[in-house]
Amino acid sequence: MSKSASPKEPEQLRKLFIGGLSFETTDESLRSHFEQWGTLTDCVVMRDPNTKRSRGFGFVTYATVEEVDAAMNTTPHKVDGRVVEPKRAVSREDSQRPGAHLTVKKIFVGGIKEDTEEHHLRDYFEQYGKIEVIEIMTDRGSGKKRGFAFVTFDDHDSVDKIVIQKYHTVKGHNCEVRKALPKQEMASASSSQRGRRGSGNFGGGRGDGFGGNDNFGRGGNFSGRGGFGGSCGGGGYGGSGDGYNGFGNDGSNFGGGGSYNDFGNYNNQSSNFGPMKGGNFGGRSSGPYGGGGQYFAKPQNQGGYGVSSSSSSYGSGRRF
């Protein structure tokens, strides 16, 4: 059996989201460009179901992960005269996590054990790309390790590739890996939930047409219903804009009103967003991504963040 015919690599790992498309781009012209790096098993420009007008983004699916890597290692990509932004497609489940679609070079690693050292993290994560910095967080007073770390890479695709993997094992223990948001992103998220309640800006920083009236970009507002922090609270990843400063100060503030305390429970009031089917931004069967304002999905309530699943889940029980 040829590698391209092998079913062993999940489709989600072989799929790329392509943002910033020209409204003139068709399935055929998108395919013509990206098939230079391998065999495409699927290629689609997402369109408004009523007007059939392009929504400015699409998806391509390769036969192998190796072909995806080859495409991502080639930049820039220009389709129909316009520079586009390919990123590894995010699954529906993962899209509900704050910051799931932001472009960052740093990951948060939670649930690591006290005997985990920097070289253990490096040995595992360097398979995904060049590591610039590893920070294992400790308590300022006691010096005790707090059960989480940050790893910074030289390229955002390394982070995207890591977070779409469901399981990561460091020194024999499963750990939780998520994107780490820069302070300015957290501040934008916090301010967005106080100031913007429109149809939703997907990043807001670059202005490329993403879909309908939405904007696709790298910084700022993800949704008009309250940004990352939910529609009611102080908002943002760090609660009232504290961001990751909370890690080094008093309570390990990670999410609006939540905490990650010494190998323990992660509590968060963050809202969930991004309904997708199999990473298809709503999919062809479940409706357009963002159509009718459907940026939020029902929280999953699947237990704690990392080590314990005894108390609250990642996502509060609110439905938007």
Swiss-Prot record:
Gene3D superfamilies: 3.30.70.330. It holds the Pfam family RRM_1. Residues 181-216, 271-320 are annotated as: Disordered. The keyword Calcium does not apply. The modification N6-acetyllysine is found at K298. Its main location: nucleus. One of its GO terms (biological process) is mRNA transport. GO terms for cellular component: catalytic step 2 spliceosome; cytoplasm. Residues 4-94 are annotated as: Globular A domain. CDD domains: RRM1_hnRNPA1 (cd12761). Residues 268-305 are annotated as: Nuclear targeting sequence. Residues 95-185 are annotated as: Globular B domain. Residues 198-216, 276-294 have a biased composition (Gly residues). The modification Asymmetric dimethylarginine is found at R194, R206, R218, R225. Involved in the packaging of pre-mRNA into hnRNP particles, transport of poly(A) mRNA from the nucleus to the cytoplasm and may modulate splice site selection. This is Heterogeneous nuclear ribonucleoprotein A1-like 2. It comes from Homo sapiens. The gene is HNRNPA1L2.
